[in-house]
């Protein structure tokens, strides 16, 4: 990894990576908190339908008022500061922006912004996973035709899962399953924005302090977000969904390889090369010990006994047969990690996950 040294070189040459961000909510604010501290990076513009909300979030994340006092995007380039406004189309059309980040959470808006990026030659990071699940493969194809990069957002679980799948395949492993953890119970699938924080087990003050959106938070525990994110993963990795969709089994970090393998091998999956989301709660509502609520995982298969023995010798999290083994990341940092996508695109010309076909979809049952 040498992204930091490349960013430092851009800073030394007074040629920072320039970003225009659309959507100043929770994800965007988390990115802004770290972007202010990142060498070689300039947030040239923050666009939001409510600019005052964006300014308040900039202040809350440690930005001094003079840092976002630019009167226009061109003024931001002259001063090295940040412009706050409400016109995404004008920002995307502006010269000097290297990368556009869509963090709106609005699928039609995200698709519209991505198409504008294709028209104006701007690389795009699609935080808006709802837009990606709906039209990502088409947007990625259009981006390729336009000579730009369309990328999933590092820090969000789909991109982190794509990274794990890529790691496994790049060293010759067959990927048996990949996915994430979440908080799931059948009885909380009926949650609404009015009662979501009761079911989310989050104190009301914590939710308010964190600017947690009740509608978005509901999607995290009613199954919606998990289905959308696994669709994004399938469309970007070639993994295919299970015949009956996601089952949210309660699984600990130490049980990944035992459970998340095909049923023919004693696991819970209907085939290898699929996705699954695991719950941090047992069906009685008690916590799974050593759960993976905020994390991601990949399960791989040993091709022969020699590799199985290596799994045992190096204390990997393997199943009883040592044929299957799991790797996991215990958490994801949302917007705090988004700078990896920005740096990877700008400095390597490489996306952090890109859809390349429609393999999955989301339905309500």
Predicted regions located by residue number:
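Rossmann-fold NAD(P)-binding glycine/threonine-rich loop
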Residues: 108-120, 129-149, 153-156, 164-167
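Generic secondary-structure signature for well-ordered alpha-helical cores
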Residues: 36-40, 59, 63, 144-149, ...
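Short, ordered loop/turn segments at secondary-structure junctions
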Residues: 49-51, 89, 105, 129-132, ...
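Glycine- and other small-residue-rich loops at beta-strand/loop junctions that grip anionic moieties
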Residues: 20, 24, 102-106, 127-132, ...
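C-terminal catalytic/substrate-binding lobe primarily of soluble NAD(P)-dependent oxidoreductases
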Residues: 2-10, 202-365
